[in-house]
Amino acid sequence: APFEEIKKYESLIQGEISYPNYEAVRKSVLSLKNELEKIGVDKKSCHIDLVPENFIEAPDGHLYLIDWEYSSMNDPMWDLAALFLESEFTTDEEDSFLSYYESEQTPVSREKIRIYKILQDIIWSLWTIYKEENGADFGDYGITRYNRAVKELQSQGGIDED
């Protein structure tokens, strides 16, 4: 679950989480749990790692989704949020994709996708701090993901500074 992942990485990080205004952002991010509970979270078989590199086109034109090691029961909107973030879809591209994807059998919640995008950006920003404490160098990856989450939070009513 994403909120547990956030707390897990926070506990693994030895130093300070030095992202700007982190405590206020954290509070706003954790409050998204209430929004998700109101909307409802579906549990279906999901891939969990929908990055472009996991889509392979065979010579015959068939498309294969590989690397199922992280698959689990999760909300399908999590996978769509990951696909949109990791593939850098524009809003128009997201709308186009969803026009093909959505049906009676596969309803879409754009609000859940928005929330899951924020959560994924926060998780990956914390993951980056943890990895960099252990010698990795990801450049501006972590702060870029953090800033994108903050921007999305601000566009939806801001960040509670209290």
State where each predicted segment sits.
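Active-site activation/catalytic loop segments of kinase-like enzymes and analogous catalytic loops
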Residues: 77-105, 118-136, 148
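An alpha-helical support segment within catalytic cores of ATP-dependent transferases
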Residues: 1-48, 59-60
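Pre-DFG segment of protein kinase catalytic domains
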Residues: 45, 64-67
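Start-of-helix signal in alpha-solenoid helical-repeat scaffolds, especially tetratricopeptide repeats
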Residues: 111, 115-119
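ATP/Mg2+ or Mg2+-diphosphate-binding catalytic cores
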Residues: 27, 127-162
